[in-house]
């Protein structure tokens, strides 16, 4: 196409894709690999609680035929649907005792599923290999099999002339502007002293966002006006992350467990509920064998129920290795009620 050719017509097509992951724990798995061909079926599951499209997983610990008798076979079966066929991709893997993905196998194409039709892998993993590595794959004799399903739904096409150009969300403009006030210390009216570092800020913004700052400024002695307000027990990096959230509603540096932990403590102290939610989400995503016990204590201390639930689930899933850590043993001495 010539670069100077005028575009007179255009359009776009949107393909709806819904994804979800199902985790299936099979207890007392070892006796299933005994040379006898048997079928294990998971509970019925769906994308949403009332979804009319329902599925189940099928496992054959000793394969489905002579070709696959040394392997474990796994399949995804469509049990019910309002309209057939259902088009979907699928991906299977085993979750190890360390919480890692292993033997990830996926369909490279979108497949058509009719009711009661199943698809998957005859030769998923060697049965003897699973049995010979029980600490890694069968902690407490439990196999954790995961399946990610991507359902391809409706296809929508629309001509370009019917599309209203996207307008930038004005809330983003506001947070960008407020962030600039903070980053460049523009028109500030107070000074906060944190571990010897001075930070210029705006009383009105701090008071509007944090009830603790509001009370602090309301009761500030008149003779202290104009003098720095000292902030105790906060690291400057943690304080900057908290202040960035106060001005912009964002906290982009919560990837590390230690930072998210310290920022959660600060957010709780200064009554920043939105920041507590961001920290809780980051800590849920960063759960590991090493920090699970510490995270459970933290969740209980700051009354974060979602984080507490996720930590308990993670610990239950990896009990054999978590229970060997020094953090777990320490927690059992100081906070035994958390798992009682």
From Swiss-Prot:
Can you supply a Gene Ontology BP term from the record? protein catabolic process
Q: Which superkingdom, per the lineage?
A: Eukaryota
Instruction: Indicate the segments forming the MATH domain, all copies.
Output: 19-149
Residues in domain BTB?
188-255
Q: Which InterPro entries match?
A: BTB/POZ_dom (IPR000210), MATH/TRAF_dom (IPR002083), SKP1/BTB/POZ_sf (IPR011333), TRAF-like (IPR008974)
**Gene3D superfamilies given for it?**
6.10.250.3030, 6.20.250.50, Apoptosis, Tumor Necrosis Factor Receptor Associated Protein 2, Chain A, Potassium Channel Kv1.1, Chain A
The protein's matches in Pfam families, at most eight in alphabetical order, are given as:
BTB, MATH_2
UniProt similarity note: Belongs to the Tdpoz family.
Provide the protein name: TD and POZ domain-containing protein 5
Gene name? Tdpoz5
């Amino acid at each position: 196409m010539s670069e100077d050719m005028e575009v007179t017509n255009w359009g776009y097509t949107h393909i709806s894709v819904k994804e979800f992951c199902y985790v299936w724990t099979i207890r007392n798995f070892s006796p299933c690999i005994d040379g006898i061909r048997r079928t294990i079926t998971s509970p019925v599951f769906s994308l949403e609680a009332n979804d009319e499209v329902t599925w189940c997983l099928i496992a054959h610990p000793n394969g489905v035929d002579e070709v696959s008798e040394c392997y474990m076979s796994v399949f995804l079966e469509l049990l019910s649907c309002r309209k057939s066929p259902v088009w979907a991709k699928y991906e299977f893997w085993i979750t190890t005792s360390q919480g890692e993905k292993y033997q990830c196998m996926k369909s490279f194409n979108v497949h058509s599923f009719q009711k009661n039709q199943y698809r998957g892998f005859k030769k998923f993993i060697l049965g003897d290999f699973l049995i010979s590595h029980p600490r890694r794959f069968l902690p407490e004799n439990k196999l954790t099999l995961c399946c990610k399903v991507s359902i391809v739904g409706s296809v929508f096409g629309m001509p370009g002339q019917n599309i209203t150009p996207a307008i930038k969300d004005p809330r983003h403009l506001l947070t960008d502007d407020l962030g600039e006030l903070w980053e460049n210390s523009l028109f500030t009216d107070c000074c906060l002293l944190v571990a010897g570092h001075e930070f210029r800020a705006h009383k009105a913004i701090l008071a509007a966002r944090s009830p603790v700052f509001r009370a602090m400024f309301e009761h500030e002695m008149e003779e202290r006006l104009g003098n720095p307000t000292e902030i105790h027990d906060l690291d400057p990096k943690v304080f900057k992350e908290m202040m960035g959230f106060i001005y912009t509603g964002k906290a982009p540096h919560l990837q590390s467990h230690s930072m998210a932990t310290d920022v959660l403590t600060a957010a709780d102290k200064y009554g920043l509920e939105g920041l507590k939610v961001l920290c809780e989400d980051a800590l849920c995503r960063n759960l590991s064998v090493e920090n699970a016990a510490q995270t459970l204590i933290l969740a209980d201390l700051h009354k974060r129920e979602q984080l507490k639930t996720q930590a308990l689930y993670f610990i239950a899933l990896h009990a054999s290795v978590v229970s060997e850590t020094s953090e777990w043993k320490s927690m059992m001495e100081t906070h035994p009620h958390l798992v009682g």
